[in-house]
């Protein structure tokens, strides 16, 4: 019964991972005759490169921006939908739905919503909040916020699920 998943794991996860780790110690162009051992040189060149540190800083910034908002939002929603309330099953389904959508689809949806001619700009201009459409993706920080918002929208449902499970396991005597 477990043979098929284990074989799948070995073939599609473990073997490629070990092969990539092995290749990281070699100079490799895809041509076997040009491959030679370089040891720590690949790692040293990565740690010396500016793009690596820029990506690292962006990743830390993304996490610092996303996690407090996502966890606060997820806990707040979990408190409201935990327990046996009428309609809570519907809401649990609705907040979890974005989690099963592909990241690429989420990117397309948000780029269309927040694009220069997107629905958000159109709505804000019609309501008189903006005089002209905003280019949400033009600046570094505004683009980062758009990515954070899209990521929160997609993934907070799983955190809500975790919080609801935890809250439903709290004994009723502990509530005031």
Short names for language-model regions:
Residues 1-176:
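A structural signal for multi-pass alpha-helical bundles of membrane permease subunits
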């Amino acid at each position: 019964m477990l043979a098929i998943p284990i074989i799948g794991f070995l073939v599609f996860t473990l073997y490629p991972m070990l092969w990539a780790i092995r290749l990281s110690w070699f100079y490799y162009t895809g041509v076997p005759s040009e491959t030679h051992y370089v040891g720590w040189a690949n790692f040293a060149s990565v740690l010396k490169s500016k793009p690596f540190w820029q990506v690292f800083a962006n990743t830390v910034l993304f996490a610092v921006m996303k996690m407090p908002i996502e966890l606060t939002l997820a806990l707040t929603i979990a408190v409201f939908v935990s327990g046996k309330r009428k309609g809570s099953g519907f809401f649990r389904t609705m907040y979890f739905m974005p989690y099963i959508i592909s990241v690429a689809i989420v990117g397309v949806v948000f780029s269309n919503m927040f694009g220069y001619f997107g629905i958000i700009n159109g709505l804000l201009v019609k309501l008189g909040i903006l005089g002209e459409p905003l280019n949400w993706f033009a600046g570094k920080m505004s683009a980062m916020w758009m990515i954070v918002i899209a990521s929160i929208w997609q993934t907070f449902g799983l955190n809500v699920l975790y919080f609801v499970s935890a809250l439903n396991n709290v004994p009723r005597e502990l509530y005031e």
